Amino acid sequence: CISARYPCSNSKDCCSGSCGIFWTCYLRKDPCSKECLAP
């Protein structure tokens, strides 16, 4: 995880990928607008 914020669609869905373990995933109204934010 290099960027502090990015759409999951650009990185294999951070919610289920390795980023999700350390980062927090936020679900927007649009399921395709998930975002992982650094803790």
From Swiss-Prot:
Keyword Secreted: yes
Summary of the tissues where the protein is detected: Expressed by the venom gland.
Keyword field: Disulfide bond, Knottin, Secreted, Toxin
Coiled-coil ranges from the UniProt annotation: none
Disulfide bonds: C1-C15, C8-C19, C14-C36, C25-C32
Keyword Manganese: no
Pfam families from the UniProt entry: Toxin_21
GO CC entries: extracellular region
Locations listed in the record: Secreted
A GO MF term: toxin activity
Family: Belongs to the neurotoxin 13 (insecticidal toxin ABC) family. 02 (Calisoga) subfamily.
Notes concerning its domains: The presence of a 'disulfide through disulfide knot' structurally defines this protein as a knottin.
Function: Causes paralysis to insect larvae (H.virescens). This toxin is active only on insects.
Name the UniProt record assigns to this protein: U1-nemetoxin-Csp1c
